Amino acid sequence: MGAQSKYAQQLNNERSLAPFIPFRSQVGPTTVITRDGDFVRTWRIAGLAFETQDKEELLIRKDQLNTLFRAIASNNVALWSHNVRRRTWDHLKSFFSNPFCDALDKKYYGSFSGYRMMSNELYLTVIYRPVPAKISRLFNVAVHRSHAEILQEQQLAIRKLDEIGNQIETSLRRYGGDDGRGIEVLSTYEDKHGALCSQQLEFYNFLLSGEWQKVRVPSCPLDEYLGTGWVYAGTETIEIRTANATRYARGIDFKDYASHTEPGILNGLMYSDYEYVITQSFSFMTKRDGKEFLTRQKQRLQNTEDGSASQIMEMDIAIDQLGRGDFVMGEYHYSLLVFAEDMETVRHNTSHAMNILQDNGFLATVIATATDAAFYAQLPCNWRYRPRVAGLTSLNFAGLSCFHNFRAGKRDGNPWGQALTLLKTPSGQPAYLNFHYSKGDEDNFDKKLLGNTRIIGQSGAGKTVLMNFCLAQAQKYLHNAPMGMCNVFFDKDQGAKGTILAIGGKYLAIRNGEPTGFNPFQMEPTAGNILFLEKLVQVLVSRDGQHVTTTDESRISHAIRTVMRMRPELRRLSTVLQNVTEGSDRQDRENSVAKRLAKWCFDDGTGKRGTFWWVLDCPQDQIDFNTHSNYGFDGTDFLDNADVRTPISMYLLHRMELAIDGRRFIYWMDEAWKWVDDEAFSEFANNKQLTIRKQNGLGVFATQMPSSLLNSKVASALVQQVATEIYLPNPKADYHEYTDGFKVTNEEFDIIRSMSEESRMFLVKQGHHSMICRLELNGFDDELAILSGSSDNNELLDQVIAEVGDDPSVWLPVFQERRKARIASSKSTGR
């Protein structure tokens, strides 16, 4: 008697997966053949972003799906669709040279620990059956055919599958982004070692094991190769063991269906915090078989007296619609397998899923008989294992398997690299926020694409925090920028002050009557700068409606060119005044350029200070983009001062224009309508919205007053020339402003109005697609003290910097310490 292994009994009892795997071999890059001679192809579908789509659009898409199903209908064709919800994890890797940005980034992504990040993946499999009958299958009679005949049969079948595939890809290519990349066939590929692998086999293996792993195309039969786990079926629960983990699954199917199948009727499951696989199959009937099925259903209702008159009438209508070709009939099955790591959790998850299905009108039940059959029926072509097969119309199938999903944005291959940041969503789907809008899986790195962004949010909705957080995250784009990067923030109410200073930038609050720190004449004496200075001085001397003559222009030009040949420390507006010649007669002298310019000079020629000397005649210019790559300018005061607004705007914009030299550039405008109300800013914004992308830059515009932005001089540019739109909650949003002005859809408008102001959620829109995101900064009290830009914190910040200097590594700890002490003191005194 031969010796036996210690585990011989267990090995003898081990149940092989091979009998339950219908696949035989991979016969092409995208095609698998089964033991019965069926040809199988699978696509991954990005999905229609249903959350923010108008209901009318969803109904149109359902009808279009039904049209597709009617077009490919044949008893040679069957469909399997899968909705896979699984846990995922992501973390954008960034490098920050600034300690505040680096610490904020690490803490932010650390806050994702324990967060249920989930993804929903949609798949559609088409099976072409050359011989759909249960006998006389292609390979059952292969012994009577030559090898050449078998190959010819295969080629014909694959060509037919190609035709069906082309119809499917054409119809579903818009089930994703605006780029027509909503569908992608699963194909073979070479790994880094040169081995041929198959995405298609990886998906089928996942259905068997619950794990994604690389699968090479084998030389042996697929039923002997696939399946890297052990499956044990109990009465209601399945145990799946792999080398990496043990998981439990319970199945749910339908005993009865909802009376109506609106598109997305099953979408509630897509917000759950557990993993699952929804499998649906639809095997087309011939029109005759479909009519016979409906006729039998009608007769059953009549014979058993179970049906009401209206139900019987509905059956007559359905038979008539089938005859007209409004839909086709098919054999349908549904199963939902819910997964967890232990028995208690899988029971809890199953109960939750049952409640969702029943709330939507389905009579759902836990699969307690042949539980393993439902598990194996996940594999396409496993007809014999399908639980509760029912007759269903293609219109109903289009409602149940409607390929709805969530918009995720673009992670990689953006013009400046990885996405700006990763955001949370109500569904747990990771959302990638970008300024630029670029297509699908294209690698658009270093491409000059549109990136202008508009942010609309009322006071208290989180607009300032969102802008400042994005500004801090954008600092990572300095790392891989060959020419560097620059941010210029045109601020209102000093909301960005703390952030600009914390990231090592320079912040200038322009207050009426106080020196601005501007001295345009200390710019480099280039031809372009000199021409700008001539235009600037002409504006200064014509502010009161005074006319600038040709002689005036000549005198201004001569004075400026004289001054610009001097050493930088001597160059200023007062020096220009000293070099302006006056007229020869009394009238000329009374209305001379010198007289008009004097009020803008520190020394008006008589030893007195001009009224507006503080605007542009400072001894040292404070703007230098070589020493600081981030600048903030607060315009709260001067934007309401009509006398000085335009000259200041002209200088700021000119300096900014000089910095737009090919380096990555972002200019930010909070309460943009207020800035563009000035003629200089208006002209700049109108032009730059169109051209800045070619210069590797973009603009970010924000406001809490949509009407003011829409009524601005450059409203069309600010509305039309944007790649990304962000809408924060606004319960008081005006329908016409949002739908007519900003062109949001009715559904998007309803979302904007219904989101809670405290939710920190917002809607992000690119092209025709949008997603709901959330910036969650719970536990970020220290960081929010900087990002929120509150007036009391700004006052404390000024005090601290005045004492210890402007090095963020020095003043930030002192600021936080004093801020906390102030809060503690307020609490102790009851204030």
UniProtKB/Swiss-Prot annotation:
Binding residues annotated for ATP, in chain numbering: G457, Q458, S459, G460, A461, G462, K463, T464
InterPro entries recorded: CagE_TrbE_VirB, CagE_TrbE_VirB_cntrl_dom, P-loop_NTPase, P-loop_TraG, T4SS_component
Q: Where is the signal peptide?
A: none
Q: Which UniProt keywords apply?
A: ATP-binding, Nucleotide-binding, Virulence
Inducing factors? Specifically induced within macrophages by phagosome acidification. Induced at 37 degrees Celsius in minimal medium, suggesting that nutritional stress is a regulating signal.
User: What is an example of a Pfam family matching this protein?
Assistant: P-loop_TraG
What GO molecular function annotation could you give as one example from this UniProt entry?
Answer: ATP binding
Summarizing the function annotation, the protein's role is:
The VirB system could be required for the establishment of the replication niche in the host.
Supply any other comment: Transcription of the operon is maximal in early exponential phase.
Family per similarity comment: Belongs to the TrbE/VirB4 family.
Descriptive protein name: Type IV secretion system protein virB4
The species this protein was found in: Brucella suis biovar 1 (strain 1330)
